[in-house]
Design a protein with these regions (language model features):
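Active-site SXXK
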Residues: 92, 102-126, 139, 268
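Flexible glycine/proline-enriched surface loops and loop-helix/loop-strand junctions
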Residues: 96-98, 132-133, 142-147, 173-178, ...
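Short helix- or helix-capping micro-motifs
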Residues: 137-139, 167
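Penicillin-recognizing serine hydrolase domain
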Residues: 43-84, 89-91, 151-327
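Acidic/histidine-rich, surface-exposed loop or edge segments in extracytoplasmic proteins
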Residues: 43-56, 93-98, 114-117, 141-144
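Secretory targeting and sorting signals
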Residues: 1-42
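N-terminal post-signal-peptidase region of extra-cytosolic proteins
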Residues: 98-102, 254
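Short, well-structured active-site flanking segments
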Residues: 119-137, 160, 205-208
């Protein structure tokens, strides 16, 4: 993997020769985020150049070791700069890689916009209007930019900031003006967001969580690449992706998702940049995702194949002006 940006100290090496650290006996996965989402910070270690992938499971240390080694192998030799977060409550498993590194969000920020909208309807004790529901569906299932821009303006920065605060997503910084795709995100905060949707909490009620997950389960086929690669066919896939080229660090290619069913659920977050093409970044994510799914599920599981390139690949999901780093 490429030399990676530390959020504070410039670049530190997480090259393919870096050590894989797997600690089995430290830190349980029961820590809670604000509002009751479980496990997002459990056992988290600070990113360091000597650690490629850190997986922890007090209950299943062998599993943690296999997943860490598999992710390490999947990312070795890739030019992509990668941040990754995995959480499986049932397996008491957490994995970390560059979790505090900031990336331009591209379209994954649309889940934050949706969460803010749903939180606002709860505060106002009302349902979504027909217009809000229409725009929310377009924004999530088709990654429609006009819908995202309309809802970004509709909820406003104040409510977006309030939602981030309630969700304890303190590392997320909203993009300037109407450029939601330049919001700064981290794998740490994106995992918190996925857990807000999966587990009961005081930020979003059950109906809102179900609504958001249902939309993420209906993303159109051409946008179901990334972390769904290799997922069990009998689990429900909830996904949102982002893809954006900028003048520096190439394509930002991100995939966030959770996988639910049969009384279990787990989340995978992969954020990347320094990708020469969109397809290259998608491949980086899918190689890691296939390893994770295969290790978290029993032998004999029928897995979904990785996505093949679609005609729409290579089209930026937001137009950024050169003055803000666009190309």
């Amino acid at each position: 993997m490429r030399w990676c940006r530390s959020p504070r100290w410039g670049r530190v090496s997480v090259a393919a020769t870096a050590a894989v650290l797997c600690a089995g006996a430290t830190a349980a996965a029961g820590a809670t985020a604000a509002g009751g989402a479980t496990g997002a910070r459990a056992g988290e270690q600070p990113d360091a150049g000597s650690i490629a992938v850190n997986c922890i499971s007090a209950a299943h240390p062998g599993l943690a070791s296999r997943i860490a080694q598999g992710i390490h192998a999947a990312l070795s030799g890739r030019s992509s700069t990668v941040a990754l977060r995995v959480y499986d409550k049932s397996e008491d498993l957490n994995c970390y890689l560059n979790t505090r590194m900031r990336f331009d969000s591209a379209s994954v920020v649309k889940v934050i916009i949706l969460g803010t909208l749903l939180r606002e309807t709860e505060t106002q004790h009302r349902h979504l209007t027909a217009s809000e529901a229409y725009l929310a569906r377009l924004m999530i299932t088709q990654s429609d930019n006009n819908a995202a821009s309309a809802l970004w303006a509709h909820v406003g920065r104040g409510r977006l900031e309030y939602f981030l605060g309630r969700a304890a997503m303190s590392e997320t910084q909203l993009g300037p003006g109407g450029y939601w795709g330049l919001t700064q995100i981290t794998a740490h905060d994106e995992l918190l967001l996925m857990q807000l949707l999966q587990y009961p909490n005081t930020v979003l009620g059950n109906a809102s969580r179900s609504y958001a997950l249902n939309l993420m389960a209906q993303v159109i086929p051409s946008q179901r690449w990334g972390v769904p690669a290799g997922a069990p066919a009998d689990l429900t896939v909830h996904v949102k992706n982002g893809w954006l080229p900028l003048a520096t660090h190439g394509w930002r290619i991100h995939s966030i998702g959770c996988f639910t069913g049969h009384h279990r659920g787990y989340s995978i977050i992969v954020l990347t940049e320094d990708n020469p093409t969109m397809a290259y970044g998608v491949t980086t994510i899918q190689q890691a995702a296939e390893v994770i799914h295969s290790q978290l599920n029993p032998a004999g599981t029928v897995f979904l194949p990785p996505s093949a390139p679609a005609p729409s690949w290579g089209q930026p999901d937001e137009q950024i002006p050169p003055s803000l780093g666009g190309r």
